[in-house]
């Protein structure tokens, strides 16, 4: 990968020496951070061969190739050192923005030392493109270019989803369908990028700003990183093309200025996306706590009622089943073993029930030791089999606690099955299922009774 990334950088040199885009160092740093197992002799040797091979096959001299490779290695491994050092020193925090600090410090200092090493070594080599009298302009050109490359490439490596996550997303039948409004920020960005080529000038750097803010507030980090890279590369190409034609005498200082502007634009967009994701995550956590029972992590009664009312009215549902279950002699369990064991029994029951339900089935703690399940589009036989399976699983899977004998318990279950559309309100249906549960208790407990 390093070899092909180097070739890409070599083939994008607008002048005789500095590449327009050099992704290799950011790629290698990202891989070493994301996959620590690559920090082995074989991994480092492979990267070294990739750097050397790419320059040699493009007719660079051996000595110059070695000098460039060492400069790149200094940038990557000093950046890796500062990343590990900063992450170890920073206190743990729930703020996702603070997790960016090691990356920002690693890129800034790693690129600094890589550029410093390059200007101290390369001008002294034969056939060098660097001159001693231009050390500092070359230093800032190298440094700014490397940081911009990192802003473009590094987030793609670090935020890329794992293959298991990709497969889960593909196999998930309940993924929200992409709607036109989801693509509006991207379309706005395409329009703003096109404007940088049509109405180009120094202000072109700001054309995509509003669309980038919109995208940062709308998309996940990896998707935003892809968009951010596209915008930065496009702006870099269009704006530098303008100054190549018009400001040849101060090309390098102008390029440095453009790069700094793009670095700030790209980094600010990424930080905004992280802040937005952090806010959305906190909102989801608060919403989850508001809709679920804190002990069993099942739906609470209010949330269950709202979702069940929607299920009753949904046009695609042709039947509904309610399963009401209650732990037998739960008060005796609490009196004999204590409330801690009672709480663990409730958690044990909820875990067993969840393992026997589909993802979209509704499962609620109705109060105390009583639970209720709503199934949609099941026939009566399927519902009875599910209820009986749950009863048997609970009966034959006792609660295991440390330093304690297994504690077994049973449940009584009442089942109601209806065809839709139906007129009775939800509470009337729950009462019928509860009456069936009462009959199960009355007939000796640990059984399933169908509502009449």
Locations of the language-model features?
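Conserved nucleotide-binding and Mg2+-coordinating catalytic segments in signaling enzymes
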Residues: 287-309, 325-339, 347
């Amino acid at each position: 990968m390093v070899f092909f990334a180097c070739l890409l950088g070599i083939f994008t040199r607008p002048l005789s020496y500095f590449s327009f885009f050099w992704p290799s160092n950011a790629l290698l740093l990202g891989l070493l951070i994301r996959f620590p197992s690559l920090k082995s002799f074989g991994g480092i040797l492979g990267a070294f061969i990739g750097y050397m091979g790419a320059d040699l096959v493009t007719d660079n001299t051996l000595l110059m190739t070695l000098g460039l490779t060492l400069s790149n290695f200094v940038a990557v491994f000093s950046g890796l050192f500062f990343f590990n050092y900063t992450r170890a020193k920073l206190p743990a925090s729930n703020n996702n923005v603070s997790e960016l600090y090691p990356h920002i410090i690693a890129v800034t200092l790693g690129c600094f030392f890589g550029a410093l090493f390059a200007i101290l070594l390369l001008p002294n080599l034969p056939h060098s493109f660097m001159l001693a009298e231009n050390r500092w302009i070359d230093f800032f050109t190298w440094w700014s270019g490397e940081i911009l490359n990192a802003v473009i490439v590094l987030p793609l490596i670090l935020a890329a989803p794992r293959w298991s996550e990709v497969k889960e997303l593909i196999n998930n039948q309940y993924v929200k369908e992409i709607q036109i409004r989801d693509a509006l920020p991207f379309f706005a960005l395409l329009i703003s990028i096109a404007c940088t080529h049509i109405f180009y000038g120094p202000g072109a750097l700001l054309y995509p700003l509003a669309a980038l803010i919109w995208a940062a507030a709308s998309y996940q980090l990896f998707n935003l990183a892809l968009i951010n890279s596209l915008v930065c590369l496009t702006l870099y190409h269009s704006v530098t093309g303008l100054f190549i034609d018009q400001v040849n005498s101060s090309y390098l200082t102008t390029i440095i200025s453009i790069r700094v502007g793009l670095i700030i634009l790209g980094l600010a967009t990424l930080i905004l996306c992280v802040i937005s994701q952090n806010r959305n995550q906190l909102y989801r956590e608060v919403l989850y706590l508001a809709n679920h029972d804190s002990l069993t992590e099942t739906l609470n009664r209010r949330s269950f009622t709202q979702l069940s009312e929607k299920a009753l009215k949904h046009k695609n549902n042709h039947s509904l089943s309610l399963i009401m279950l209650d732990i037998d002699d739960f008060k005796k369990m609490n009196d004999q073993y204590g409330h801690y064991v009672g709480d663990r029994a409730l958690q044990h029951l909820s875990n067993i029930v969840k393992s026997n339900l589909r993802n979209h089935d509704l499962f609620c703690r109705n109060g105390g030791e009583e639970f209720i399940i709503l199934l949609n589009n099941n026939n009566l036989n399927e519902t009875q089999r599910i209820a009986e399976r749950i009863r048997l699983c609970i009966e034959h899977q006792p609660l295991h606690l440390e330093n304690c004998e297994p504690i077994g318990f049973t449940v009584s279950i009442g089942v109601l099955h209806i065809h839709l559309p139906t007129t009775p309100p939800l509470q009337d249906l729950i009462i019928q299922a509860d009456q069936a549960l009462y009959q199960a208790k009355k007939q000796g407990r640990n059984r399933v009774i169908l509502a009449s």
